[in-house]
Each structure stands twice: as structure tokens, then as C-alpha cells.
Curated annotation (Swiss-Prot):
It is an enzyme of class 2 (transferase). PANTHER family: NAD KINASE. The keyword DNA-binding does not apply. Belongs to the NAD kinase family. NAD(+) binds at residues 68-69, 142-143, 153, 170, 172, 242. Its cofactor is a divalent metal cation. This is NAD kinase. SUPFAM superfamilies: NAD kinase/diacylglycerol kinase-like. Its main location: cytoplasm. The active site is at residue 68. It comes from Koribacter versatilis (strain Ellin345). One of its GO terms (biological process) is NAD metabolic process. The gene is nadK.
Length: 285
């Protein structure tokens, strides 16, 4: 029997009215449903699966119910296995989760009929290196951020690209963003907007103590190294705004293109239409 995974945002009361009929609809169309632990609480007699274990069960595709944050978490869990994601917006912004709830079933019909465009999004792979050893490895759909933690002190950074020193500065932080992440934290820090298909990453400083430092766009083939220097004990590594690790002076964060991409089942709206509708881009009033 074909299987589909359902992953949802925790503590979302309206899911009690969404998930049971969704399970019934999928069953009528020949699908067995794998629920993550957040979704299973809305279905009687079902024990949910840890999100990290869903990929090993090889569902045909995954339905994500929530906002952009839910999608980011789900992407890190299922993208390595090449599982396509249909993201249904239950959040506030919904920049990535572009399918409205009222269009969920009609979009699912298109997915089942293999008539739904597949949009591949580049991911970042990130290694945290301490004392010459890889301490942790991560993947990210939006961004890798090194910034100050609780104490309001500037942190020093050395940035290299492909083994060549580029610059150092003191700042609140530095962002390495994918094209998808260019409309997230990097945008708020003054970084450029990249179309999702652009083969590039961007390095965006956060409040640098300088009159000259600007965001830099590099090819996706580049390897980006960030070494934490002064006040390193006040620095923190964050992946997609969700997973974090305190840093020490001398820690190195190495970012490169991940071996896998996120496959999004989408309605194929114009990227610039989404910018206008979600971020009010280009509006004069």
C-alpha cells in the first residue's frame, strides 16, 4: 500500500478538525498515513513516529501542516531521503507554505495525478569544528547564523571563501543564507533577495561595526569558513532559527552546498507575486 507522511505544527488546536478528515480522504485514495508525534495526538488509536525516523519509512510524499517554521523542521528530517513535501499554510506569513488550507484537497488531487510542479531548493551543509575535530554537522534550508548570545557585545569573525581569507570584522553576527533564506533573516539584515533557482549563497553581516562591510554573494560551489575570534564565548550557532549550539573562541563553522535538495510540491505561483503578497514588495503606500 502507498504511504504518505503527515507532519504538523505542535499545539495547533484547529488540527483536530483538519487531520481526521485528511486521514479519511487519503485512505479513500489508497494511502496509508504515517503520522509524526505532533499529528498523532489528533487521531485516536495512533502512535506517532519520531520525525527523524519518518524518512526511513519511505513515504511517497509528506504533507506539512503549519507555517514556515514547521516546513523548515520537516525539510531537515525528510529532504535527505528525497521525499517531496506539500506544505499547507496554517501560519501567519506562509512564505514557503504557499498552499492555503482551502486548496489542500484540490492540490492533493493534482499531486496524486502527478500534475503538481516540483520545485527543488538548495540546502546548506554545515560543520562545527572545534580543536580540529567535527563536533556537529547540520543541514539548513534557510540559513546558518553565528551571532551574539545573551550578552550585548560585538563578536569578532574571520571569513574565508575556498580557503582564501576575505575579511574580518566585529558585528552582532554573520548569516550564510541560501536563495530560499534570502527572504528570511538575511533580508532583515540588509541582504539581497535571490530567486530560488539562483546557484549562489550570500554572506550577510548583522550590524557590523564598520562603514564599509556589505553582503557578499558567492557561487554555490564555494566553501565558506567562519572562525569565531574575540568574545567567542558570547557567540551562538543557529540553524534555521531552530537548532542551536553555544560556541567558543577559535571554533570554525564551515558551510557548503548540501548533497541533497528540498523538493517542494507547489502551486507554481510567481516568485515575485509571492514577494508582493507576503512581504508587500514594491508597494508605495
Amino acid at each position: 500500500m502507498k504511504t504518505v507522511a503527515v507532519l504538523s505544527k505542535p499545539s495547533k488546536p484547529e488540527l483536530s478538525e483538519i487531520i481526521p478528515p485528511l486521514q479519511e480522504w487519503l485512505g479513500q485514495h489508497g494511502y496509508e498515513v504515517i503520522f509524526d508525534q505532533q499529528s498523532a495526538i489528533y487521531v485516536s488509536g495512533i502512535h506517532g513516529v519520531e520525525r527523524a525516523k519518518i524518512a526511513a519509512m519511505h513515504p511517497e510524499f509528506a504533507i506539512v501542516l503549519g507555517g514556515d517554521g514547521t516546513l523548515l523542521s520537516a525539510a531537515r528530517a525528510v529532504a535527505p531521503a528525497g521525499i517531496p513535501i506539500l506544505a499547507v499554510n496554517l501560519g501567519s506569513l506562509g512564505f514557503l507554505t504557499e498552499v492555503p488550507l482551502q486548496d489542500m484537497y484540490s492540490t492533493l488531487e493534482r499531486v496524486i495525478a502527478c500534475n503538481c510542479p516540483l520545485d527543488e531548493r538548495t540546502m546548506l551543509a554545515c560543520d562545527l569544528i572545534r580543536d580540529g575535530q567535527v563536533l556537529h554537522s547540520y543541514t539548513s534550508l534557510n540559513d546558518v547564523v553565528v551571532n551574539k548570545s545573551a550578552i550585548a557585545r560585538l563578536v569578532g569573525f574571520d571569513v574565508s571563501i575556498d580557503g582564501r581569507f576575505v575579511f574580518n570584522y566585529k558585528a552582532d553576527g554573520v548569516i550564510v543564507a541560501t536563495p530560499t533564506g534570502s527572504t528570511a533573516y538575511s533580508l532583515a539584515a540588509g541582504g539581497p533577495v535571490l530567486m530560488p533557482a539562483v546557484g549562489a549563497f550570500q554572506i550577510t553581516p548583522v550590524c557590523p561595526h564598520s562603514l564599509t562591510h556589505r553582503p557578499v554573494v558567492v557561487p554555490e560551489t564555494a566553501t565558506i569558513s567562519i572562525v569565531v575570534r574575540s568574545n567567542g564565548e558570547a557567540a551562538f550557532l543557529t540553524i534555521d532559527g531552530q537548532v542551536g549550539q553555544p560556541l567558543k573562541e577559535g571554533d570554525e563553522i564551515v558551510c557548503r552546498k548540501a548533497d541533497h535538495a528540498v523538493k517542494l510540491l507547489q502551486m507554481r505561483q510567481s516568485f515575485f507575486k509571492v514577494l508582493r503578497e507576503k512581504l508587500k514588495w514594491g508597494e508605495r503606500e
